[in-house]
Amino acid sequence: MKEHIKIIANNKKAYFDYFILEKFEAGIELFGTEVKSIRMGYCSVKESFIKIDKGQMYVLNMHINPYERGNIFNKDPLRVRKLLMHKLEIRKLSSKLQEKGLTLVVLSVYLKSGLVKVEVGLAKGKKNYDKRESLAKKDQKREIENEIKRRNFYKL
């Protein structure tokens, strides 16, 4: 059976601010109105981060807009949500977080075979000069692609 993946929210800022060392997939504990809201695309992970507390993983600052027809069943849009991973994986991540400068960030939220999943990244913060360097590389790559397009256009 083929898995259907629909990306709901991406955290592009995480790739700019951090070096992503490893990626993991985790489930997330949600209420029904939150799932409906996510299916409609009302989710933001721009400022979200992950905390490990007593062997459990929690995502903080993940904004899910209230479902418009949810009335009293709607929850706080910024509430703390539990991530679902195996204990062994959580212990492994917890030990890696003890290293200096490592953190866990949310990279994306997506639907996989009808279930809401979160892509978690083990990340190391970039310095300002690293950010400038990555911007320069991106600009250089864009200029090269434009030059190739321009030359191919005039060949015809």
PLM feature segments, named:
Residues V35, I50, I64-N65, I90, ...:
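Residue-level signature for short turns and capping positions that connect secondary-structure elements
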Residues M85-G121, G125-K127:
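Beta-rich strand-turn-strand
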Residues K155-L156:
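N-terminal targeting/trafficking signals and adjacent low-complexity tails
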Residues F31, L60-N61, H86, L107:
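A secondary-structure boundary/capping signal
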Residues E3-Q56:
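A positional/architectural concept
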Residues A9-A14, Y42-C43, R69-L88, L122-N152:
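Arg/Lys-rich, often Gly-containing low-complexity segments of ribosomal proteins
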Residues G55-I72:
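Short, surface-exposed acidic-centric catalytic microdomains
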Residues G32, I52-K54, N61, V120-K124:
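Flexible glycine-/small-residue-rich
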